[in-house]
Amino acid sequence: MIQAFDGKWSRFRSDSLVSECSHSVNDIPLDRDEYDMLQLYEQLHAASEGAITPLIGQVLEDMGYDTHYSLRPKDYIQTASDWQAQLTLHADRLEFKAPALIDIGAAGKGLLVDRIATLLKKDAPEYSIDAGGDIFVGGAAERIGLEHPQDQTRAIGVATLQDQALCGSSSNRRAWSDTLHHIVDARTNTPVSHVVASWAVASSAMRADMASTALFFLSPRIVESIIQKCESIVMYDDGKLQYAVSKEIELYV
C-alpha cells in the first residue's frame, strides 16, 4: 500500500506518476478519497486566492527542496502555474493540460495515514499511527502533547483523541535557511513568515493534514467553514494563539 502510494504521488521519485506528469502530458487516475483530497485543494485554492495549490512542486524544487535534498536554491525560481490553465479535476482523474510538477504534501501523508488506519481497524480494536506528526488514534482515547515550535521540551497544550486525527505544521521543521522552509505562498514564491505553527484535529488525517497547512494562509474560521468539524490552533510569530477548540483540547494559555 505505502509503496503503491509513493509510486503514484511522490515527486521525490523519478519513476512516480507525478514525476512522469512533469515531463509529459498525462492524467492521474483518482480513487474516491484522492478526488476528495483534490476537491479540498481546489476549494482552499479559491479561498486563499491562489496561495494554496498542488502546483507548488516546481517552486519547492527550485528552492532546493528537491529530489536530491540539495537545499540550495536556484538563481531563478519559477512561479507556480495557474490552476485553471494547467489542471482540470474530474471525479475519476486529474487532467494535465501541459506538463507540470505537483506536490500534495499538504494532505497526501494524511491520506495515506487514513488508508493505513482503515487497514488496521479490521483487526485491531485499538491502534495509533504516528507518521511524522500526522497522528491517528483509533479505539481507546489517547492524550497527545502539542509541542511548542520553539522549545521541544515544552507543550502548548494536550489533545485527547479517540477515532480522530491530529496534524501539526511548523515552519522550523523543514527549514534549510533562516528564510526558507516548505510552506510557500504560491502567489509570491515566498515562505510564510507570520505563522510559525498550526495544529488541527479532524475525523480523518487527510482533513487534519490539509487544515494544518491551510491555517498558514487562512483564519481558523475560514478553514473550518471549508473543512467542517475541524478544530484548529494557530501560533503567530509574536507568540500569540488563535484557536477554536472543544473541551478535548486543553491549552496552557
Feature annotation, model-predicted:
Residues 1-253:
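Mature catalytic core of soluble alpha/beta enzymes
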